[in-house]
Design a protein with these regions (language model features):
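Short, glycine-/small- and polar/acidic-enriched structural segments
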Residues: 21-152, 157-161, 173, 177-183, ...
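Short, solvent-exposed loop/beta-turn-alpha elements that line the ligand-binding surface or hinge
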Residues: 48, 116, 202-213, 281-290
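Secondary-structure end/capping motifs
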Residues: 227-307
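Pocket-lining segment of extracytoplasmic ligand-binding domains
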Residues: 166-261
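Extracytoplasmic/secreted envelope proteins and their assembly/folding machinery
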Residues: 34, 66, 81-84, 121, ...
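Sec/Tat signal peptide C-region and signal peptidase I cleavage site
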Residues: 14-20
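Conserved C-terminal helix/tail region of periplasmic/extracytoplasmic solute-binding proteins
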Residues: 298-333
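Sec-dependent N-terminal signal peptides
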Residues: 4-14
Length: 333
């Protein structure tokens, strides 16, 4: 009887696998802004929704994921909201449908002996500044900083160094003087005594100091065409991801890290736990977009991106709360 039950269970599992809907999801890097995505995957929430998720980590920043989405080589992107604005200025319709992080989580770090002083912005001149990749939100950060202080992009060298361990190594090895990046890189730099945080946009106040307001960052987004053609898949992805946001809210940083694959954890585990603890405040609790907050990234992009500045951007078409609201009505954690 037991063998029969086991065999039946195995057949049911095979049938469920065969009926699973395939969806390709890509992420620019496993910085902590994107953490709800691997948490949902590790806890099996996408499988629970009947999805067979294929994941690609470009490990080079959000601009690469955006390119893949527009080219049709991925279905859903895990990246920053500001890319939806950028695409609308190019007459391409990309829509955010779950907000993961409600603040940037970005910092500007320097070596311990750096002579750059944020109180004297001109001291950044001549510096090599590491970002995740050209066209990424870390790139937007430094360009906005330069613009706000009446400095030119030509006053510095902007260099793509990736994120996580690669970014930390670039600073440690002297390939760059300053680093614009996320946790865990930010916490690793400090914990290892490799440098110090000079500008910190991880908190609400920090975001207001840097950007002038709350700056929504990591979201799940897809092309409008894909959303229109696959609303059930988008809903299932949303259900699983919102469930992960709820789960993260209810668990400690240590419990969250314990659920992640070892190869996801950058640096030593204790430092990574500290990084997750530092980042927990940036995550959305319910996945909803707050329309007023979306004005901040629009203002930032307009300040240095000519295409965005010249375009008439309709923020209402850059996001939707439809699927998050449906997930909330479904309930469950």
């Amino acid at each position: 009887m037991r063998k029969y039950l086991l065999a039946t269970a195995a057949l049911c599992a095979l049938a469920a696998s065969a009926n699973a809907e395939s969806v390709r999801m890509s992420v620019g890097s496993y910085n902590l802004n994107n953490l709800p995505f691997p948490v949902a995957a590790s806890l099996g929430f996408y499988k629970d929704e009947g999805l067979d998720v294929t994941t690609e980590n470009f490990a080079q920043g959000g601009s690469k994921v955006l390119q893949a989405l527009v080219a049709g080589s991925t279905d859903v992107a895990v990246g920053f909201y500001d890319h939806t604005i950028q695409m609308q200025s190019q007459n391409k319709h990309v829509v955010g449908f779950v907000q993961l992080a409600r603040n940037s989580g970005l910092v500007l770090a320097g070596t311990n002996d750096t002579d750059f002083d944020p109180a004297k912005p001109e001291t950044i001149k001549g510096k090599k500044v590491g970002i995740t990749s050209p066209g990424s939100s870390s790139d937007f950060f430094i360009r906005y900083y330069m613009k706000q202080h009446n400095l030119s992009d030509n006053d510095i060298s902007i260099i793509g160094v990736g994120s996580g361990a690669a970014a930390v190594a670039a600073l440690q090895q002297g390939k760059i003087d300053l680093l614009v990046n996320y946790d865990p890189a930010a916490t690793i730099v400090v914990e290892r005594g490799l440098g110090k945080i000079l500008i910190d946009a991880r908190s609400d106040q920090g975001a207001k100091d840097v950007y002038g307001g709350i700056y929504p960052t990591s979201v799940l987004y897809a092309t409008q065409d894909y959303i229109n053609a696959n609303p059930e898949v988008i809903q299932k992805v949303t259900n699983a991801t919102v469930r992960a946001l709820h789960w993260m809210k209810q668990h400690s940083a240590e419990e969250i890290v314990a659920k992640l694959p070892d190869d996801f954890v950058s640096g030593d585990k204790q430092t990574y736990i500290k990084a997750v603890e530092a980042a927990k405040a940036i995550f959305s609790e319910d996945g909803k977009f707050e329309p007023a907050d979306l004005e901040t990234p629009l203002a930032v992009l307009k300040s240095f991106n000519d295409a965005v500045a010249k375009a008439t951007i309709d923020l209402n078409t850059t996001y939707t709360n439809k699927f998050v609201k449906a997930a909330a009505s479904k309930g469950g954690n």
